[in-house]
Amino acid sequence: MPGGLYRTIVGADALAYGLVAGANLVGLKLVLGSYPITPASSLLHVLAGMKEFGVTTFQAEDEISAVCCAIGASYAGSLGVTSSSGPGIALKTEAIGLAVSTELPLVILNSQRSGPSTGMPTKTEQSDLYQAVYGRNADSPVPVLAASSPADAFDTAIEAVRIATKYMTPVFLLTDSYIINAAEPWLIPDVSSLPQDKVEFCTAADADGFHPFLRDEETLARVWALPGTPGLEHRIGGLEKDYDSGNISYDPENHHRMTMVRKAKIDGIANDIPKQAVTLGSEEDAVAVVGWGSTYG
């Protein structure tokens, strides 16, 4: 192991520290909207004890309220986060589609367990990958990340926050019952070495020609304007928007254009992440076996 100061860390703690660090690195307050479910409840418990780091936690009456709370927090200028396991994610899918449509940053944590339905709540399983990638109506692309170990959850959480805010998109972060409950040595990082990418909100100086779906030429992310900013009054929602004005549109050609730009935005994230390296064997070998999450090795 590399030299440095280590401590034993549980996956839930690493996730919480990573989310708090990620929010701090982009200059946002963290708001968690969650509803208890095994094995994801431990993250809610840990973050609820982090008020001194500017964390707000809201235990909602159900999964739908929890994710909608997180979306509302992001609309208001915070980092919205929601957490659950497979059955709860199933209930959140319509609201996650709303976050795709409104193009708001949202980090969605799924601590996977055995299914289907109630399944085996206390047993681990990596069975929600397709749910994360495809589990919404229509064309609703989102990036999906997976932690490979309890310690790796810290770095993966920071990366999820970075991508969500840079590209104005919901991001799935997959763990499982093993990762969130297991413990391992964690190399405490040098905070000064962590990547800082502060969010820049639109200001009153940007009012001329403003609409909420103006886009960055490189990332295709839309602009982020806080409600109540003078001259930046706007509306966003689940109805399709006109590409050139942000107004509601039922035009089929415009819908195709918006569908393709949302897809291109997510596809472009591939240019912003490191290329994957061979863990065992050689790049010259004939067969590649791809692992991910807690079985990546």
Set out the residue ranges of the language-model regions.
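Flexible, low-complexity linker and terminal segments
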Residues: 1-18, 22-26, 156, 161-297
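Short, well-ordered, mixed-charge alpha-helical segments that flank or form enzyme active sites
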Residues: 115-117, 152-153, 180-183
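Active-site/ligand-binding-proximal alpha/beta "capping" segment
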Residues: 139-162
